[in-house]
A protein has these predicted regions:
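Active-site neighborhoods of divalent-metal-dependent phosphate/nucleic-acid chemistry enzymes
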Residues: 68-118, 123-125
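Active-site-proximal, substrate-binding regions of enzyme catalytic domains
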Residues: 21, 38-82
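Buried hydrophobic packing segments
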Residues: 11, 44-48, 98-99
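Short active-site oxyanion
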Residues: 1-2, 31-34, 65-68, 103-108
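Fold-independent oxyanion-binding glycine-rich loops
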Residues: 8, 38-39, 112-113
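A generic structural signal for short hydrophobic patches within well-formed alpha-helices
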Residues: 11-12, 41, 116-117
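Short, well-structured N-terminal submotif of metal-dependent ribonuclease cores
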Residues: 1-36, 49-59, 124-125, 131, ...
């Protein structure tokens, strides 16, 4: 089914089971590959450490090993600094610029962060939220 760009909100659902986890796992099993920005390493590790559970940290490592990490290049950082909408948060802008750097026509962004999803769509990317039935306000 092509590759998917998965942001930290999606990756963390693979670490700690939530309502969308089963649907997300089923979707990802059909993908040819998964990519994310290397900033996801920091985001996921910080979340795991906040949880204070060694098993969560170990699961975080396993999840991150299953994803190809895109480096933070000068081109990605420059693009992130100029992306619209201007209100997009900095880490989301880096995720978005990283996704836009992938030369894969059929790639979809998987995120459970509605602001990130809106920004991705505004920049021409297709967004999926497996297991999410209704948009949260």
């Amino acid at each position: 089914m092509g590759i998917a760009y998965v942001d930290s909100s999606a990756l963390l659902k693979l670490v700690v089971s939530e309502g969308e986890t089963a649907a997300l796992e089923a979707d990802l099993a059909t993908r040819d590959g998964l990519v994310t920005s290397s900033i996801a390493v920091v985001e996921c590790h910080r979340a795991a450490r906040r949880a204070g559970d060694r098993r969560i940290l170990q699961r975080t490592e396993l999840v991150l090993e299953s994803v190809y990490l895109l480096g933070l290049t000068a081109v990605v950082l420059e693009r992130a600094s100029t992306l619209r909408p201007v209100g997009i948060r900095s880490l989301d802008a880096i995720h978005l610029a990283s996704a836009l750097s992938v030369d894969e026509r059929d790639m979809e962004v998987i995120t459970y962060d509605d602001r990130m999803a809106d920004a991705a769509r505004a920049n021409g990317l297709r967004v999926q939220q497996p297991g999410r039935t209704a948009r949260r306000a």
